[in-house]
Amino acid sequence: MPNEQSEASVLSRLNPHRFTTQIPQHPLSQNMQRRRNSVSSAASDSINSLKQSSARAVSNSNGIQKNNKKYMRSTVAGASGILPTYNKSMSFSQNKNLDDNNMRASLPVLERDLNANNFKSANNNPIGFSSFSQPYSGSRDPRPLRDKNFQSAIQQEIFDYLIQNTFEIDTNYPISLKTLKQPTQKSFVTIFKWLYLRLDPGYTFTKSIEYEVYQLLKILQYPYLESINKSQISAVGGSGWPKFLGMLHWLVTINLRLDKCLNTLDQNLLNQQTQDLTTLSKPVENIEDQEVRQEKYELMAERLFIDYITDSYKTFLNLKDDYSDHMNELKAGFERYLHIIKLDVNNIQSKNENMFEKFEISRNRVEKLKVARGKSTALNGDLVKFQKYVDSMKAKSEEWPIKLSKIEDELNEKKENIKLITEEISQIQDSLQRKGLSVEQIENKNEQKLQLEKEIDQIAEKADEFVSLIKSTKVDNEKVFVTFQDSIRQYNDLLLEFLTSRRKLGHDIEIEPLKITLPNEVVVPNSENALTMDKLFPTDHPMPEYYQNMLLSINSDIMKRIETLKTDNQELEREIGMLTEEINSRGSTNESLELKLSDLNLNLKNVRQENRAEILAQSLEIEKLERQITEGNKNIEQKIANAERIVTELLNEKEVLYNEHSKFKSDLNLKIQKLIKEAHSLRFAVKDSTNRLNELIFTESSETDD
């Protein structure tokens, strides 16, 4: 239950709605996702977002060249659509009950479940709402906007949507049905800005409202844009209000469908997180399961860092400098993350203990099996020997009659000998009785002799056991000493690697006092020259505190260098921001040049129409004015040649400007890539050094505690 509660608390803080149009994300490859560090990955993604913004501006310029009537804003829609592809590991759900305004702070798209292509209409509409964003082929709006009942219905829908989504709180502007029936210019502007900012929270209104409303509707591909002109936008009341009321209702419909998409994305992401945690709760059966679990842990840690960086960047965009709340959320998330890992470690330890018990049982069974096999082998050998003995006895049974006769003869001889011996025994007994000795006394002496022989055998067996015990103890001591030598050698190698890595980073430290040197000859214990702790660690200070203080001082130096590197990275980020502003200014210049080109093309079209009219008029009078027609044709051809020459020159000029812009963009990309490589190399070096130092500190602390 605690594990499930901790997983549920982690899921409760995951928020899939983490998208800002000012920060388009670039999906990373699978290998880069596994290797990148959680902190530096966010910086790399921010730099990639700047590159993607410039690429999107170029794609917009290409779209203008192909179609003079399309001018796309890079913050809302590009050639690939309004919904940018977002990596599935870049979104978290911190609070499922956030309001819709916070939900629109981001708009991620799952690579596995949802794709930007799913939102494209049949006409390749970049907005992606196929049912209501297709341009209307006619010039007339088919909706009955002049009908009072229809107006009341859509006014009620707009009013309900504004009230349900806290329009008055967000804008500090009162709203009522009367406002929608008798609008003012201010109320229309406020409602339009609020509805559009729900679609694109990163957009900032800077230009005149007439220009911006018309351009934004053009970007959104409002199907009835031909029924609205810029002059009407400056005064929306009166007879023209039904057109703008229908336009506001269209924006409300877009927002409602966007809400539905966001809910779908939220549910998909929650399902994905639940699947991830379900995978973590499953037992590990093989190496592949362990790798999958490791990837899940890395993704959880990356998501925590990305969530923190995204929130901090949004706070920075809002001109706020207090990031303490985001840091507290990051700490709380990591505490839950560590709790999950600890639970997993405890489960693994309990499984290891159970498996060790099973191993001991199996090992005992194997020992018993070995003993049984030895006994079986010995019995088989005895069986073979007994069979050979039986065979030999069968061969000798044929000789037994002769031997029996010999044995009978020998038996008779033995009987005679027994008689003689019996007589001798009686004589000996008589002599013993005369000497005062008895047979019982002699038997007692023999029994004492046998008892002493048994005791001698037992002492010899104990001596053999003691010798074998001494040999096994000596072997164990040699193994322990070899392990001790390997540990000392590994410790010194780690110190050298740590010193080498720090020197590569320009950090010269002294680690000679930390080295451990073994004497050439190790004397047996309990002697004057035996190896002791004082000889192994020759220092005047207490050993744990001395080494701990030295390691802490080295760690503090490394942390100071890390802080310095962070300051340098912040300066690099500021330079990147300046370069981004310069790219945006170049993009606006390119847009103005394209507008000029469209005007020139329009003038060229008018000139050609005039020339064709003159040619048609002269062709009617060809019989009467042949000479004049010939001269007129020459003049017309000359004018056409001049016009084409002018167009060619303008196209060449545009090509030159575009090449200059592409060259500048490529140079800037090279600089940014160089900065990314330097930041990555620096980050990997710092991470490697920090990990090794932590391992060294942990090893030293463990040895000190022992």
Curated annotation (Swiss-Prot):
Disulfide bonds: none
Main location: nucleus
Polar residues bias: start-end ranges: 18-32, 50-66
Chain positions covered by the region annotation Disordered: 1-70
Coiled coil, from the record: 402-472, 553-669
Gene3D superfamilies: Ncd80 complex, Ncd80 subunit
Low complexity: compositionally biased ranges: 38-49
GO terms, molecular function: identical protein binding; microtubule binding
Annotated keywords: Cell cycle, Cell division, Centromere, Chromosome, Coiled coil, Kinetochore, Mitosis, Nucleus
Subcellular location: Nucleus; Chromosome, Centromere, Kinetochore
Gene Ontology biological process: cell division; mitotic sister chromatid biorientation; protein localization to kinetochore
Cellular component GO terms held in the UniProt record: Ndc80 complex; nucleus
Domain of life where this protein originates: Eukaryota
Pfam families: DUF5595, Ndc80_HEC
Subunit structure and binding partners: Component of the NDC80 complex, which consists of NDC80, NUF2, SPC24 and SPC25.
Biological role: Acts as a component of the essential kinetochore-associated NDC80 complex, which is required for chromosome segregation and spindle checkpoint activity.
Family: Belongs to the NDC80/HEC1 family.
Protein name: Probable kinetochore protein NDC80
